[in-house]
Amino acid sequence: MATVIDRHSQPTWRDFLELTKPKVVVLMLITSLIGMLLATKAPLDGFVPWQVLIFGNLGIGLCAGAAAAVNHVVDRRIDSIMARTHKRPLAEGRVSPSMALGFALLLALAGMAVLLAFTNPLTAWLTLASLLGYAALYTGFLKRATPQNIVIGGLAGAAPPLLGWVAITGHLSAEPLLLVLIIFAWTPPHFWALCIHRKDEYAKADIPMLPVTHGERYTKLHILLYTLVLFAVSLMPFVIHMSGLVYLLCALALGARFLDWAWALYCDSRPHAAIKTFKYSIVYLFLLFMALLVDHYLPLKLLL
């Protein structure tokens, strides 16, 4: 099916907003904000400077929106085929590819300028690397080249808490890299569960997702294995004394539930297990990071 790009309709501000994938950007900014808060020295000095809070997240959000707009351009043919995405602005021809690319460039330049002016160069360059990793490496190449696209390209999507942390400290350390590792390990079981649910759509669009190339049974096994890896990685903040007992208990409970869903999916023991595993994975990551944050601001010396 050819992409519908020959319709002549005036794009609206809503079309350009949709190009940025605002829901995804909001989720990224939540993890960026959590990274900023975790980088502070709570509870005595646990506040983020307002300039970094506002302009740091603004710059990161603008660059994330730029990467999303490039994704719309590159994936416009695929989007026109899949039921979930066929009404996107480029798939329906409401915005031209050249207009979307110009919009993406404008967002990227504005985001980089804001980050350089109000945070630090390391944050700006790491954000640019994340943008290029998602827009060029993942969207432009990996997505169509290998069923391991999500694993390799997941680093770009895992970057926001690192960016938020570095915006505060100005340097890299083990703690934000561990936050990246948690999201990196979470991404495959999260996305592969959705891919199983939408396997036929990905096959129709000729995207080599793991369930399409290797089958559902193989994919379910890898979801289970990655969930085990995630469970172990999620305990590392406690091991390195980044967090305390409150986080540990939450990580154990949340991880056990994730493993329960991954096992149910592998054994085919529950109806609609794939989409339910996908939905729980979102709840899992949100609550895990909330637990990190709550633990960070609690006077844990009274609890241990």
UniProtKB/Swiss-Prot annotation:
Instruction: Write out the annotated subcellular location.
Output: Cell inner membrane
Main location as per UniProt: membrane
Q: Which GO terms describe its molecular function?
A: protoheme IX farnesyltransferase activity
For this record, the Gene Ontology CC terms, alphabetical, are: plasma membrane
**Top enzyme class:** transferase
Membrane-traversing stretches: 24-44, 47-67, 99-119, 122-142, 150-170, 176-196, 228-248, 280-300
Keyword entries, A-Z? Cell inner membrane, Cell membrane, Heme biosynthesis, Membrane, Transferase, Transmembrane, Transmembrane helix
EC number(s) for this protein?
2.5.1.141
User: What reaction does this catalyse?
Assistant: heme b + (2E,6E)-farnesyl diphosphate + H2O = Fe(II)-heme o + diphosphate
| Pfam families for this protein | UbiA (PF01040)
Keyword hit for Cell inner membrane = yes
Which residue windows are coiled coil?
A: none
Topological type in the membrane: Multi-pass membrane protein
- The source's domain of life comes to Bacteria
What pathway is this protein said to act in by its record? Porphyrin-containing compound metabolism; heme O biosynthesis; heme O from protoheme: step 1/1
Function, as annotated: Converts heme B (protoheme IX) to heme O by substitution of the vinyl group on carbon 2 of heme B porphyrin ring with a hydroxyethyl farnesyl side group.
Q: Which family does it belong to?
A: Belongs to the UbiA prenyltransferase family. Protoheme IX farnesyltransferase subfamily.
Q: What else is known?
A: Carbon 2 of the heme B porphyrin ring is defined according to the Fischer nomenclature.
| NCBIfam families from the UniProt entry | cyoE_ctaB (TIGR01473), PRK04375.1-2 (NF003349)
The identity of this protein, by name, is Protoheme IX farnesyltransferase 1
What gene name is listed for this protein?
Answer: cyoE1
